[in-house]
Amino acid sequence: MKNILVYSILLLSITSCNKNNKKTIILSKASENYVNWIDRRDIIIIDAYNISNTDSILNLADGIILTGGEDIFPLMYNDTNNIKLCGEFDFRRDTLEKNLFDYAFNNKIPFIGVCRGMQMMNVASGGTLYGDLPTEIGDSILHRNNGEVMHDIIVTNNNIDNISMIFPVNGKFSPKKYFFNVNSWHHQGLKLIAEDIIVIAESYDGLPEAVVINTNVHPFMIGVQFHPERLGKYHPIHLNMRDKFFEQIFK
């Protein structure tokens, strides 16, 4: 976390000095796991949540990651019924992450949404969310249980280019025969899927677990409901998502 604090404090220096071919990744709200996931000598990490004027950092972004966190305020997707089902809100963060998504989308910046970040990806694109999964779709699959749980997800898309942005797949691929065991810690999820968002994988209750934006619209916008940053540094999904993200950033 030390590097993030330094970069936040010295933002004026970053904007005025040559970055020496380093690339800048903006995290919507940083934590140690996210920093460790993407930390490299040629990467500058900025914690947007600790910047008072986020407009001042947008043009620095070579990549943007929306991280996990609180529930998104339901009025952002025109839902008043969900308010009573939600936990805590962070209105400033809602606005910040909507702005970061819009900037990434409009400027073709490589983008990852994790957990809440994938939900914001859908909401910002015009989709909606389930307010509380056990209440609305049942508890056949536990998505959290006093903390993080593990469960299987199944790849449901057959476009190998889309799938490989997130999952480590090689050679001949058969949809609905590819399973991954992932971590889970959420009580909300994607309901109405926004236009241009393609579901790549689902849990057994049909909840979207991985998505991409149509590559005809944006070259690299991906989202996952699970937490790749906490899967372990040698986990194939942890590595694949990071490497594909870096490939786009360093093109």
Predicted features by range, described:
Residues Q119:
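Cytosolic ligand/metal-binding cores
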